[in-house]
Structure formats: structure tokens, C-alpha cells
Amino acid sequence: MQHTLTRTASLPERSSSAHSAATALPALRRPPDSCETLVPLLCIFWFVFVSMSPLPPARANKSDNKGLISADRNNKATLLLTIPRCTSKSYTNDLSPLKMTLLSAGKHPRPFRQEHRC
């Protein structure tokens, strides 16, 4: 079955020039430039009200502190963490690790490793 295209009387004939084709077709009605005026208004709103708004006031609380974490000075368990090591008090010496010394039972202690001479 062969289909043929026929022109109807309601459509105007197309011509070779673009100008005459545009004038021959009925003009489509668009909404009155609502999209073209809305975008610049949104840009102006963003610039004026959002980017130019003042920064929120600085809050002084412990959750905003991004620096070094310091121990609570009222807590005796963490008090040692706040004292510099060179100026520590005498009671911190009790908590420091003990130095171990090795004692030998004989006159000549055995070496830990065998000495290999070449």
C-alpha cells in the first residue's frame, strides 16, 4: 500500500525564504515574557538579600571551639593533661613510669647476644 502526502487547504504554502515562511504561519502566542523577567529578578534577589546579608553573630561556646582540646581543670583525673611536663608537680612523679634496672647475680654478666668475631 502506497501512502501519498497531500496538502490541506488550512496550511499555507511554504516559500523558499525564511521571512515569508514566518509571516505566512500564524503567530503563536507565548506567555508575556514571564521567564525572561523572572530569571534576572531571582539573580538580583540572590545578590542583594543572600550574598549581602550580614554574617551571623559569633557564638562563644565549647562546641564551636575548633582548636586544641583541653581537659577540664576541675577534674583531677584530667588535671595532669593540662600541666606541661617540665613543670609537673611532685605527685605526678608517682604516676610516671618507673625506670627498670637489670641486676646480675654473677661477677661477669652474660651478654644478651653472642658476640661473633670474623
UniProtKB/Swiss-Prot annotation:
It is found in: Membrane. Residues 1-20 have a biased composition (Polar residues). Residues 1-26 are annotated as: Disordered. Its main location: membrane. Keywords: Membrane, Transmembrane, Transmembrane helix. It is a single-pass membrane protein. The chain crosses the membrane at residues 38-58. It comes from the Eukaryota. The keyword Transcription does not apply. GO terms for cellular component: membrane. This is Protein YLR162W. It comes from Saccharomyces cerevisiae (strain ATCC 204508 / S288c) (Baker's yeast). The lineage of its organism: Eukaryota, Fungi, Dikarya, Ascomycota, Saccharomycotina.
